[in-house]
Amino acid sequence: MSYRSLQRAYQIWAPIYDRAVVGFSAAPRAANIAQIPAAARKILIIGAGTGLDFPYLPANTLNVALDFSAAMLSRAVPRAAGQVQLVQADAEHLPFLDGGFDVILMHLILAVVPHPSRALAEASRVLRPGGTLLIFDKFLRPGQRAPLRRLLAPLSASLATRTDVVFEDLLTQRPELDLVEDQPAALGGWFRRLRLEKRV
């Protein structure tokens, strides 16, 4: 799916997005964000959507939230409440300098973007050495057959998500990132919470 198609899809999704995802995503979001190191000062949220992560962010941090969809970001404004800077931009071409963030959140975004490997590469680029990357999304595991999920992939892509992304395939392209925690998060482990650290 192209970013133009994503824009159209999320214009439709935006009014119902919260109702669709809050139920299964609230607890994993909170659990992931609770792992943000106390020393973190600059946090980037890639794929911020309607701002469902914002209530869980720590105090006294500089928070930047990015999304490609204007329709989604408009709904994030009340949750930002002056504590989060909102940026409309492409996750595959981040408008930030290298190593500028202590922590990056990627919740329900890698299975949405057209090229998840590019989005992960960009997240790694703007994460400082020693920084933390927190991911929550649906992934297949290496070698997992999951015929129904693979069969649904073309249909789900038309609905602005994918069901056939293997995270380990993405990670092999990023040797500077170490996976330090991998927890099942929802739907029998299809959704996972991942914590990664960038090597110094």
Please provide the spans of the model-predicted regions.
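N-terminal, positively charged/glycine-rich alpha-helical extensions of SAM-dependent methyltransferases
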Residues: 1-13
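C-terminal alpha-helical "lid/dimerization" subdomain adjacent to the S-adenosyl-L-methionine
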Residues: 4, 20-23, 134-194
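Conserved alpha-helix/loop element of class I SAM-dependent methyltransferases that forms part
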Residues: 23-41
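Short glycine-centered segments of the SAM/dcSAM-binding site in methyltransferase folds
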Residues: 42, 130-132
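Class I SAM-dependent methyltransferase SAM/SAH-binding core
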Residues: 42-93
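A short acidic, Gly/Pro-enriched loop at the edge of an enzyme's catalytic core
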Residues: 92-104
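A short SAM/SAH-binding and catalytic strip from SAM-dependent methyltransferases
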Residues: 103-115
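A short glycine-rich, Lys/Arg-flanked "PGG" loop and its adjoining helix->strand segment in the class I
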Residues: 117-129
